[in-house]
Amino acid sequence: MIQGLLFDFFGTLVIYDERRVHQRFPRTHQQLADHGVRLDEQALIRGIDQVFTRFELDARDSMLEFSMADIFTVVLNNLEVDPLTVDLEQLAHCYTQEWSADIKPIKHVQTLLRQLQREYQLGLITNTHFAPMITRLLKKFELES
């Protein structure tokens, strides 16, 4: 007898665009400009995307996930900014807020989960690179229980 159901967050509970260069990141750009980065926003975002792509390819081979702190440590080193001088947690919050701005819950997902919760234990899995983003989105979409 089935007692529980697991859901993957991205692509199952929400609709999202996994690309990282299709929208603007003005606050992320400003935070890095405040630390002396003199790239325009698009060049900066392309640089972040290149680091992400490299980490994703490495993760496919190693089966080890990475964090936003890992990404921004490499990005900052590439930009010759000491990562120890930057609040990586705040930078990750800023970047993931901008990246996730267009994420939407699938239609009627709240109702579906409430109905399923009456009979099953529900669980969530995700391989996110920044757990606070998932917590924030669950709250925003009223998917917490």
Q: What residue ranges belong to the model's regions?
A:
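Local beta-strand N-terminus motif with an aromatic residue
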Residues: 2, 143-145
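Glycine-centered loop/turn motif at secondary-structure junctions
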Residues: 36, 80, 119-120, 142
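Substrate-recognition element of Asp-dependent hydrolases with the DxDx(T/V) motif
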Residues: 88-105, 109-141
